[in-house]
Design a protein with these regions (language model features):
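Conserved ABC transporter NBD signature motif
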Residues: 62-76
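Catalytic Walker B motif of ABC-type/P-loop ATPase nucleotide-binding domains
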Residues: 153-157
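Helix-to-loop junction immediately C-terminal to a conserved catalytic motif
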Residues: 54
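ABC ATPase "signature
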Residues: 211-212
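Conserved ABC ATPase "signature" region
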Residues: 100, 104-124
Length: 239
């Protein structure tokens, strides 16, 4: 398959923090137009892997290629949207001002209303971020990540604190973005969230334990539930 089919190519990536391996020889490929889930417990290495995709973490071994360019490459970041676990917002600015600022960074003046409507915050656009609830800040952070219509969208625990009804709507939106060719990487430790992805990478202790569709992973583990598959492939006995 041609390289330009892939939005992300990770080959043998390793990274340690002190003596602790955060990533241990991870290799994976993510296609354009694919929703790919990184599933694992807290501390598994999901965030470190995502940060390596935007050049915030430099691997000690291996290579990271994003949208056909070896990372880190500043020019690539204009085509990438990144939503961190902790909302990276300016608390004294309004929701609209935050989204407009992040759009301007990427040279995009339009799309602010569309992004805020996507996360159902247009009616609160004039609210100062410091007055918003945690869930609303999460949604504002998501709007900032997608306002410039990126080719690759990286979402680190994107629906924490978001109510179930809006979560469904957001996922419908992610699906439409993927259908338009955007590659989306979602990290999560929640099983029902992971089941919405086209393919999954199961991560524990910095290692990629298994990769494939939900059905393929369940079949490989010989179980009916994704949670049981993760435990079995992790070498942990289900109680």
């Amino acid at each position: 398959m041609a390289t330009d089919t892939y939005a992300v190519e990770v080959e043998g990536v390793a990274k340690r923090f002190g003596k602790q391996p955060a990533l241990d020889g991870i290799s994976l490929r993510i296609r354009r137009g694919e929703v790919y889930g990184l599933l694992g417990p807290n501390g598994a290495g999901k965030t470190t892997l995502i940060r390596s995709l935007v050049g915030l973490v430099a691997p000690e071994q291996g290579t990271v290629t994003v949208l056909g360019r070896r990372m880190p490459q500043l020019a690539v970041l204009a085509r990438v949207g990144y939503m961190t676990q902790q909302a990276a917002l300016y608390p004294d600015l309004s929701a609209e001002e935050n989204v407009r600022f992040f759009g301007a960074i990427h040279g995009r003046e339009n799309g602010v209303r569309e992004a805020l409507e996507f996360v159902e915050l247009w009616d609160r656009r004039t609210s100062v971020v410091s007055t918003l609830s945690g869930g609303m800040r999460t949604r504002c952070s998501l709007a900032c990540a997608l306002v410039h219509k990126p080719d690759l969208l990286l979402l680190d625990e994107p629906t924490v604190g978001v109510d179930p009804q809006l979560r469904v709507q957001l996922w419908d939106g992610f699906r439409k973005m993927a259908a338009g060719g955007t590659a989306i990487v979602v990290s999560s430790h929640v099983m029902d969230e992971a089941e919405r992805c086209d393919r999954l990478g199961l991560i524990r202790f910095g290692k990629l334990l298994a990769e494939g569709t939900v059905a393929e992973i369940k079949s490989r583990a010989g179980v009916d539930r994704l949670e049981d598959a993760f435990l079995k492939l992790s070498g942990v006995s289900a109680s």
